[in-house]
């Protein structure tokens, strides 16, 4: 399972996780990434702060950020790159997903075609 955080995304997440810690010893927090049905294109990205992975989550580390990926969402997220972009009007995380056949204008939801090695549709 490959999820890549750019340097800017890792920096922002690290700062956010440090700021959300309840005490100085809390260092096990990470982010959990998944997708759900929704959004204007079919699937919607979810990114939550968590201290514990779910039993079937795939776990990796990007820099000093723990990344938990929902196992059911993994085929849809394989190879995703998460960046943090800043602009005049808005700033936020940008998802570049090689499995997306199209994305909505806001970039928060996507449509996926065949994203599994066996040729089984993602949905």
Curated annotation (Swiss-Prot):
<protein>
    <recommendedName>
        <fullName>Protein HesB, heterocyst</fullName>
    </recommendedName>
</protein>
<comment type="similarity">
    <text>Belongs to the HesB/IscA family.</text>
</comment>
<dbReference type="GO" id="GO:0043158">
    <property type="term" value="P:heterocyst development"/>
</dbReference>
<keyword id="KW-0535">Nitrogen fixation</keyword>
<keyword id="KW-0364">Heterocyst</keyword>
<dbReference type="GO" id="GO:0051539">
    <property type="term" value="F:4 iron, 4 sulfur cluster binding"/>
</dbReference>
<dbReference type="GO" id="GO:0016226">
    <property type="term" value="P:iron-sulfur cluster assembly"/>
</dbReference>
<dbReference type="InterPro" id="IPR016092">
    <property type="entry name" value="FeS_cluster_insertion"/>
</dbReference>
<dbReference type="GO" id="GO:0051537">
    <property type="term" value="F:2 iron, 2 sulfur cluster binding"/>
</dbReference>
<dbReference type="GO" id="GO:0009399">
    <property type="term" value="P:nitrogen fixation"/>
</dbReference>
<dbReference type="GO" id="GO:0005506">
    <property type="term" value="F:iron ion binding"/>
</dbReference>
<comment type="function">
    <text>May be required for efficient nitrogen fixation.</text>
</comment>
<dbReference type="InterPro" id="IPR035903">
    <property type="entry name" value="HesB-like_dom_sf"/>
</dbReference>
<dbReference type="Pfam" id="PF01521">
    <property type="entry name" value="Fe-S_biosyn"/>
</dbReference>
<dbReference type="InterPro" id="IPR017870">
    <property type="entry name" value="FeS_cluster_insertion_CS"/>
</dbReference>
<dbReference type="InterPro" id="IPR000361">
    <property type="entry name" value="FeS_biogenesis"/>
</dbReference>
